[in-house]
């Protein structure tokens, strides 16, 4: 993160104010203030993650992934013959906190702040799948988007999507 001295001073002052406004997290803000004031390059990358950017395309892809899971659930609910489909395989698991934290953060924002897909079960880990899911979801999306009736999927189509 490249910042001018003036920008670093402004951010340092913001962290100083946050220590007073939020005493429970004061130690964290003091640490961040020190990093900014001294310009520690390695630790500045941590701040870059906090202020990172997610492209519009990535956001739309995540929404499409969540919408696909909604469609899977609606289709599964409407099936008369479930053909040994396990409902747990249809559930949206989220993303891996260790390797896909930005995606996970966006999912939590969409559910908790925007109020979308609130019917999804966040589980005990708050949509942390604890295993990387991005590639799997991409394969699933490709199949789902090729289905002619995306919200009226057959058992065979559901099976193809979840087994992608």
Curated annotation (Swiss-Prot):
It comes from the Bacteria. InterPro entries: UPF0304_YfbU, YfbU_alpha-helical_sf, YfbU_helix-hairpin_sf. Transmembrane segments: none annotated. Belongs to the UPF0304 family. This is UPF0304 protein YE1336. It comes from Yersinia enterocolitica serotype O:8 / biotype 1B (strain NCTC 13174 / 8081).
